């Protein structure tokens, strides 16, 4: 009888240990949130995140609001926290609107990261950053300058919204560079498409009609750039320089037809992968302070940089920026090498 009891205890203990291991494994769930679903740029980032999850044995859920709103993202964050997710990675539609929800999540032990578009740094641990505002603002102006070869020119800025963190930081730097290096360029308007394809096309056509002598549209937004290109084709404006940021799959026909000579971006699939690998490092309690590096299969080494790289004044332990290794300028010679 005693021997039978000992066996039962041993079996129950083993079952308990196995259950504990299974619980830990099941708890390693990461939510990857875009500004909104249905946009190729964000879908590609989500694909990269889920590929990394499969490689690491982590369940990565990709979900976002159907339109870019703070309330939509907050609802998703709260839902994922209540479902017991261990980490949330979000492309924030507002630098501060998500902060109360994200801080509550961190207080409950959830790891919070941002990708593509940041919050205030105190509202997350790490920002997986495609490039500093200075890098990306300069990139926009340089692409325009390759085509606008005159001292006096008229330029329009066109992107998603006046409140989104990342694009406004880039545009601020781009406008500063224009002021310093191209003082003869007049910025005639700054307008927004609000991440809506139909509204973006209408806005782009309105800009072109309102400024018939416009020389360039700078559109650092995945919806605004193709909308500007389509508007130029619709209105037969062949001599208009159109530059900005979007995905190669969306922009390929405009490049092939010569409407867009060049545009830029970064490997957003890679950005999704890096985000999940960094989140996994946090879940495994690996060292991730400023100066620490992480080797990512197929990508290489990424390093934690201080928040000051993004122009912030907030620094703390376990907090910083992870920059993508490189950015890409696409043109007719290289665009077919990319598929995202």
Swiss-Prot record:
- Please state the span of the N-terminal signal peptide per the UniProt entry: 1-26
Q: Highest taxon of the source?
A: Bacteria
Transmembrane segments annotated in the record for this chain: none
Localisation per UniProt entry: Periplasm
On whether Transmembrane is a keyword of this UniProt record, the answer is no
SUPFAM superfamilies noted in UniProt? Periplasmic binding protein-like I
- Gene3D superfamilies with a match to the protein in the record: 3.40.50.2300
User: In this UniProt entry, which cysteines form S-S bonds?
Assistant: none
Alphabetically ordered keywords of this record? Periplasm, Signal
Q: What is an example of a GO molecular function annotated in this UniProt entry?
A: carbohydrate binding
* Primary residence: periplasm
Instruction: Tell me which InterPro entries the record gives.
Output: Bact_Solute-Bind_Prot2 (IPR050555), LsrB (IPR030159), Peripla_BP_I (IPR028082), SBP_2_dom (IPR025997)
A Pfam family matched in the record: Peripla_BP_4
Q: Which GO terms describe its cellular component?
A: ATP-binding cassette (ABC) transporter complex; outer membrane-bounded periplasmic space
Q: Which family does it belong to?
A: Belongs to the bacterial solute-binding protein 2 family.
Subunit description:
The complex is composed of two ATP-binding proteins (LsrA), two transmembrane proteins (LsrC and LsrD) and a solute-binding protein (LsrB).
Main function: Part of the ABC transporter complex LsrABCD involved in autoinducer 2 (AI-2) import. Binds AI-2 and delivers it to the LsrC and LsrD permeases.
Protein name in UniProt: Autoinducer 2-binding protein LsrB
- Which organism was this protein described from? Salmonella typhi
Gene name, Swiss-Prot/TrEMBL:
lsrB
């Amino acid at each position: 009888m005693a021997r039978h009891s000992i066996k039962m205890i041993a079996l129950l203990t083993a079952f308990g240990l196995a259950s504990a291991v299974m619980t830990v494994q099941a708890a390693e769930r990461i939510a990857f949130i875009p500004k909104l679903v249905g946009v190729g740029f964000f879908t590609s980032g989500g694909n990269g995140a889920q590929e990394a999850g499969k490689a690491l044995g982590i369940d990565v859920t990709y979900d976002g609001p159907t339109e870019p709103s703070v309330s939509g993202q907050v609802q998703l964050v709260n839902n994922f926290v209540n479902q017991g997710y261990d980490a949330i990675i979000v492309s924030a539609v507002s630098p501060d609107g998500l902060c109360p929800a994200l801080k509550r999540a961190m207080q409950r032990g959830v790891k919070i990261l941002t990708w593509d578009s940041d919050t205030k740094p105190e509202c997350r641990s790490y920002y997986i950053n495609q490039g500093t505002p200075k890098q990306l603002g300069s990139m926009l102006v340089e692409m325009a300058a390759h085509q606008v070869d005159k001292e006096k020119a008229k330029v329009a800025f066109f992107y998603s919204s006046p409140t989104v963190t990342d694009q406004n930081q880039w545009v601020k730097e781009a406008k500063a560079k224009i002021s310093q290096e191209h003082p003869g360029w007049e910025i005639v308007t700054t307008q927004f498409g609000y991440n809506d394809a139909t509204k973006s096309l209408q806005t782009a056509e309105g800009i072109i009609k309102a400024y018939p002598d416009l020389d360039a549209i700078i559109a650092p937004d995945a919806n605004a750039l193709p909308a500007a290109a389509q508007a130029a084709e619709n209105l037969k404006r062949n001599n208009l320089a159109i530059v900005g940021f979007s995905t190669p799959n969306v922009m390929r026909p405009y490049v092939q037809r010569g409407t867009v000579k060049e545009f830029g971006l970064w490997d957003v699939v890679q950005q999704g992968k890096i985000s999940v690998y960094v989140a996994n490092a946090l879940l495994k309690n690996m060292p991730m302070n400023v100066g620490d590096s992480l080797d990512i299969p197929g990508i290489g080494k990424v390093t934690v940089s201080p928040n000051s790289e993004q122009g912030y004044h907030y620094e703390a332990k376990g907090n910083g920026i992870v920059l993508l290794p490189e950015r890409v300028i696409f043109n007719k010679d290289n665009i077919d090498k990319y598929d995202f």
